[in-house]
């Protein structure tokens, strides 16, 4: 693998929504996007999702994590089998716990084992060093968002919002170098509390098209109460763990299912709207990526609330299902070349840092 020339990289991502494994190929030199390749999605079964949920909040060394690790390994292997041969793999793993205030983060998944199994070098453990050096360890996709804006030849700032289990916002000015043209942070909860509620109350994995929320009325007093959570007063950049807002389910417990779904959806929008106060300037466009963009009611509310054009990133010619997986392909290429993956205004790390470690496939 020539690290100074463009290479094909496969990125693997399993997010906090616990939907499944996204896998995508990217042709890149670690600076520019030079081509998009094949992608694959392997959904988790109900049983696999249950196993993964059992690991949430746990840390390395917990003996109950063996079965969780097997699910992570096997499903990622299955995703890779649906892709062509590549030069490098970027493997995020499954976030189980994230506590940057105490210098800890846990992404389950053994990149060294994956490299042995597939015979390809693997970049993994992207977040630990950033957290160890005082950063938040998240979000990491912003540098890829910068590359996307450059690929689209944008000439003015834009906001890219990923709606996974947690919401993340990246403000990008593509006219500037990444270190100066990025600001990123977590906006608050996104799909996770709503999905958890749907599973608990209705035995459904998510609110399809936002149909349940559309039938309800949001309790704006509860939304305002939630927005007084101390997280929203913290300076940016900042990040959260999926479990930090697990109490939301009990907050809406007294509401009907329809009103609870509407309230949980309104909370997502309120977090993003509040996030705009932190931006250097309001962009004219907001691109939405991640699973939340498929929630018709959520997108309707965002378009109504935001003071700029809001669009599904697919409308711009990108695959919104695969942006996160592509991001970890791009990050892997950057790590291989020693380029920084996080910055002061994305994770809060003091100086630009190239996180992640490489495991080389063993040759016998």
Where are these regions (language model features)?
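A glycine- and small-aliphatic-rich helix-loop capping segment at beta-alpha/alpha-beta transitions
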Residues: 25-32, 102-113, 146-150, 173-181, ...
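Short beta-strand-loop/turn "lid" adjacent to the catalytic site in phosphate-handling enzymes
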Residues: 59-111
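Phosphate/ATP-binding catalytic cores across multiple sugar-kinase/actin-like superfamilies
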Residues: 75-83, 257-282
């Amino acid at each position: 693998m020539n690290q100074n020339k463009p290479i094909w990289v496969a990125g693997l991502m399993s997010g906090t929504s616990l939907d499944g494994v996204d896998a995508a190929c990217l042709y890149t030199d670690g600076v520019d996007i030079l081509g998009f390749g094949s992608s694959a999605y392997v959904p988790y079964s109900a049983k696999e999702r249950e196993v993964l949920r059992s690991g949430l909040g746990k840390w390395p060394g917990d003996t109950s994590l063996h079965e969780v690790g097997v699910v992570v390994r096997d499903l990622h292997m299955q995703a890779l089998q649906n892709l062509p041969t590549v030069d490098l793999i970027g493997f995020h793993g499954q976030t189980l716990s994230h506590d940057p205030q105490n210098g800890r983060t846990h992404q389950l998944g053994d990149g060294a084992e994956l490299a042995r199994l597939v015979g390809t070098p693997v970049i993994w453990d992207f977040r630990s060093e950033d957290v160890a050096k005082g950063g938040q360890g998240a979000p990491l996709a912003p540098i890829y968002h910068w590359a996307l804006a450059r690929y689209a030849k944008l000439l003015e700032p834009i906001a890219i919002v990923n709606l996974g289990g947690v919401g993340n916002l990246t403000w990008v000015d593509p006219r500037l170098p990444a270190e100066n043209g990025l600001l990123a942070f977590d906006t608050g909860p996104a799909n996770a509390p709503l999905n958890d509620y749907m599973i608990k109350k209705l035995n459904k994995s998510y609110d399809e098209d936002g149909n349940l929320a559309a039938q309800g009325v949001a309790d704006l007093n509860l939304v305002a109460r939630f927005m007084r959570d101390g997280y929203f007063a913290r300076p940016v950049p900042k990040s959260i763990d999926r479990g930090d807002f697990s109490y939301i389910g009990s907050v809406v417990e007294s509401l009907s299912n329809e009103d609870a779904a509407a309230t949980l959806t309104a909370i997502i929008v309120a977090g993003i709207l509040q996030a705009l106060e932190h931006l250097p300037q309001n962009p004219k466009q907001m691109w939405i990526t991640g699973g939340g963009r498929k929630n018709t009611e959520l997108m309707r509310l965002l378009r109504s609330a935001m003071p700029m054009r809001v669009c599904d990133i697919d409308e711009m010619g990108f695959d919104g299902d695969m942006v996160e997986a592509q991001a970890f392909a791009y990050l892997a290429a950057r790590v291989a070349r020693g380029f920084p993956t996080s910055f002061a205004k994305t994770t809060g790390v003091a100086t630009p840092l190239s996180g992640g470690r490489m495991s080389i496939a063993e040759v016998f």
